[in-house]
Amino acid sequence: MNTAKELYDRWLAQPELDTAVAEELHGIAGDDAAITDRFYRDLEFGTGGLRGVLGAGTNRMNLYTVRKATQGLADYLNATDLPKKIAIAHDSRNNGELFTREAARVLAANDITACVYPRLEPTPALSWAVRYLGCGAGVCITASHNPAKYNGYKVYGADGCQITLEVADKILAAIEKVDCFDGVKLVDYEAGVQAGRIVSIDDKCLDDFVQAVYDQRVGDGTGIEQLKLVYTPLNGTGLECVKKLLAKLGVTHVTVVPEQETPDGNFPTCPYPNPEIREAMQKGLELCDKAHPDLLLGTDPDCDRCGTAVPDGKGGYRLITGNEMGIILLDYICRTRLTRGTMPKDPVAVTTIVSTDMATPVAKKYGVELRRTLTGFKFIGEQIGKLEAEGHVERYIFGFEESYGYLSGGHVRDKDAVNATLLVCEAAAWYAQQGMTLLDAIEALYKEFGYYRNALCSFAFEGETGMYTMQNLMKTLRADPPKEIAGYAVERVADYDTDGTGLPRANVLEYHLAGGHKLMVRPSGTEPKIKVYLSAVGKSEAEADAVNAELAKAAEMLMK
């Protein structure tokens, strides 16, 4: 195995090395720490594909690591009976177009047709295109809501769902056989176009995607045209599809946050373009103070997550959490479909193990089977696929995760913020007809089912030493599990890496505490972070908030 310094020297010795890559490598000459950080490993490839910091080296996102991954994907696909066609999309992130072109060049050289969106488009539109065009796989160049220094390479299967662990392992095995310089086949981009191996996805595909979302309407739309919205795409891809959908719905009172309207991979107004974070929604909230809308909607750069704020009744606006919106929409969909007689027999809703436990009593009230999966919407998409294989895809009525991902139909197999926009607008309009806001709605649900409070604490571990620290922390928690957390006895520990949970093995620890509270520890699959999910329940808002605050302090202690 080559050392980091040997790899560094080999990269610099390459003829015709990309100028930007060469400049960065020359700039760190003699800096052992910088060289090691860029070359001590290859970027990890898993079910989420690749994700990493932009830059030079094997541990960075650059045209060479993208080429290598694509060659491995091509080798995998060519060894299967799947269609030799791959759809590619990219969002607004820096180098998105470059990586798209490089991936297409590699695919074309391997006799695989690359179907490329001609401009940046949402991730769910890529999931749609894979199935719509009959592709064997899909690639989306995105790092979702990560900071601007990141980009990624997300791989989808022929079903439009993110790849399974089994497929990821096969693709990884193929990638590991590829030398990023000598082992990659390439054609000139224009030559690939002329040969018919690189083709542009036409507008009909995208228009039909928006129509498919529109067809997911649950209610009759009464009052929806009266809604007044402020919308921000957070300098990402959402504007085109969201505005097309709103026009179909008859929602014309839409004000777009001007500073965040244009795609910009530097995300100048919000370092973390994540609608879960107040800072990302701040410009929208400021505009709300002037425009006084019924709703503020924000979609992340690849338009698969949707954040919402509503009037708080005190002259301001209150952000709705991902769990709260998931519960509002689950209740709205169940209530409306039962009322309209459109609820299927044996309905199924799906959520994840880290999403709110409040979904359980809500689903039970309406006679809906609630399935829980591992973290990641790909597992929700997998459940849709299983129902489809059984000939009962219509049983699926809704899926959500706490990180602002929602999907109410089988038109795509990933979270879809365009679909979420439809659902949120529908629910807001329905409650408005009852003289209520979405804030009133969640308050009524809390009074009915109990006050559930969920929070996420993220602990960052950067660089080479960070990975080892994360591994050692998880090892320690397994070897010496806590007997109590925040003063609450640990009644049961579930280790998803060893226990017979009925789910695939995963590096997740779950602590069930006295009083019905819960704490879960999970290293991120895409970032150098350990995520701790807190869940508290109380008879009042104050009680649940107090327990949550205690759990947050305890989480910090666990991570030290």
Residue positions per predicted region:
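N-terminal small/polar loop signature for handling phosphorylated ligands or for N-terminal nucleophile
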Residues: A87-Y150, K248-T308
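Glycine-rich phosphate-binding loop plus the immediately following alpha-helix
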Residues: Y156-L186, N323-D346, T351-V362, A417
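Phosphate-binding and adjacent anionic-ligand microenvironments
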Residues: D289, P293-L295, G316-R318, T336-R522, ...
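Conserved phosphate/anionic-ligand binding catalytic regions in large, soluble enzymes, centered on
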Residues: F39-N59, A143-S144, P233-C241, L245, ...
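Short glycine-rich or small-residue beta-strand-to-loop segments that form or flank ligand, phosphate
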Residues: K85-D91, K228-Y231, E240, L407, ...
